[in-house]
């Protein structure tokens, strides 16, 4: 895979994300502007300028009309993608570590950090839309709900919405995950310990019925949303910063590497600065993609399953389009199952 290297940031990447159609790619970093790119050729569509601090998180709504960013400058901003204008700013008491639109596009969750004697919380903001055009007509100024860190849990580090926005799933700094029912006053349904270190990323399957978590403890887990049981575990030999589930193929892509603060003059191979592709079902590593010369901070796979993007500590974004060998790869047991199915169809 020959990557397209996107040079739009001067500082470490914090998040990369595709829109629902997969034609746009959003990137944000520790510098003060976010970028929007065409995912097919890596051409930059534009930048989102207006924050005064590092941008920790970015997300596009289901219509690709708006996107939201959360920043270390204590603000959440909503932007129109037609012209890159900021149309709403919510001020917060602490830095904002994660933002995400709900699947319906009417709510935004934001993780507020646990600093300056604040316990950390997940705030839910509401936006009102014109049902015909999907344009936002009103931004509700105050959060409609605040999930303050529960006793027995550390502050949330990552969070997202399950299918149809039924639950909010959060990963915490103590390695626990938790589930909140949005239809029952955002009550805590259950929580459990899955990692030994802070949960560094949480991404959902295409149908949002299960999700993958990863951590600096070098492990990633796939967890079912309804049962909250760990279905699969992927063990690596380096700390993980990001994990994504691929559509079309039964794979997961993991990324991380030696902590940036510990990197001195080690070679890229020693630092483990590569994306690892694991078989989702068999839990075995099947390939690696090298290229970054610092830890991988964020990985995203296009919803169509045709490309993936990684953002690194060195400020580079690498956009990879999968080749034929990726789609053709199968274990012997998968080939046998396909052959059996083919024979039964012919019969």
From Swiss-Prot:
The keyword Cytoplasm applies. PROSITE patterns: WD_REPEATS_2, WD_REPEATS_REGION. Keywords: Cytoplasm, Initiation factor, Protein biosynthesis, Repeat, WD repeat. One of its GO terms (cellular component) is eukaryotic 48S preinitiation complex. It is found in: Cytoplasm. WD repeats lie at residues 8-49, 51-89, 149-190, 194-233, 291-330. The keyword Protein biosynthesis applies. GO terms for molecular function: RNA binding; translation initiation factor activity. Belongs to the eIF-3 subunit I family. This is Eukaryotic translation initiation factor 3 subunit I. The lineage of its organism: Eukaryota, Fungi, Dikarya, Ascomycota, Saccharomycotina. The gene is TIF34.
């Amino acid at each position: 895979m020959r990557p397209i290297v996107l040079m739009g940031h001067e500082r470490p990447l914090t998040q990369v994300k595709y829109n629902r159609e997969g034609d746009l790619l959003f990137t944000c970093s520790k510098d003060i502007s976010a970028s929007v790119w065409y995912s097919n050729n890596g051409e930059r569509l534009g930048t989102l300028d207006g924050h005064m601090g590092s941008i920790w998180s970015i997300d596009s709504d289901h219509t690709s009309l708006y996107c939201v960013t959360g920043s270390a400058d204590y603000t959440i901003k909503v932007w129109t993608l037609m012209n890159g204008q900021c149309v709403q700013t919510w001020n917060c008491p602490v830095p904002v570590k994660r933002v995400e639109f709900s699947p319906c596009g009417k709510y935004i969750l934001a993780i507020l950090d646990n600093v300056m004697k604040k316990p950390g919380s997940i705030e839910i903001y509401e936006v009102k839309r014109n049902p015909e055009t999907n344009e936002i007509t009103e931004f509700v100024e105050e959060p409609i709900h605040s999930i303050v860190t529960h006793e027995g849990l550390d502050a949330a580090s990552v969070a997202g919405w399950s299918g149809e926005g039924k639950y909010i799933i959060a990963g915490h700094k103590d390695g626990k995950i938790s589930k909140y029912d949005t239809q029952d006053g955002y009550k805590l349904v259950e929580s459990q310990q899955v990692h030994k270190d802070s949960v560094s990323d949480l991404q959902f399957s295409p149908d949002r019925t299960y999700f993958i978590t990863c951590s600096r403890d070098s492990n990633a887990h796939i967890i079912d949303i309804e049962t909250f049981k760990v279905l699969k575990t992927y063990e690596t030999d380096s700390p993980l910063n990001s994990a994504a589930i691929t559509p079309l193929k039964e794979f997961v892509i993991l990324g991380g590497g030696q902590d940036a603060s510990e990197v001195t003059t080690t070679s890229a191979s020693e630092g483990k600065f590569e994306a690892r592709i694991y078989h989702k079902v068999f839990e075995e590593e099947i390939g690696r993609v090298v290229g970054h010369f610092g830890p991988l901070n964020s990985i995203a796979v296009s919803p169509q399953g045709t490309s993936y993007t990684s953002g690194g500590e060195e400020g580079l974004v690498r956009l990879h389009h999968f080749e034929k060998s990726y789609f053709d790869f199968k274990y012997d047991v998968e080939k046998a199952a396909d052959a059996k199915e083919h024979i039964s169809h012919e019969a």
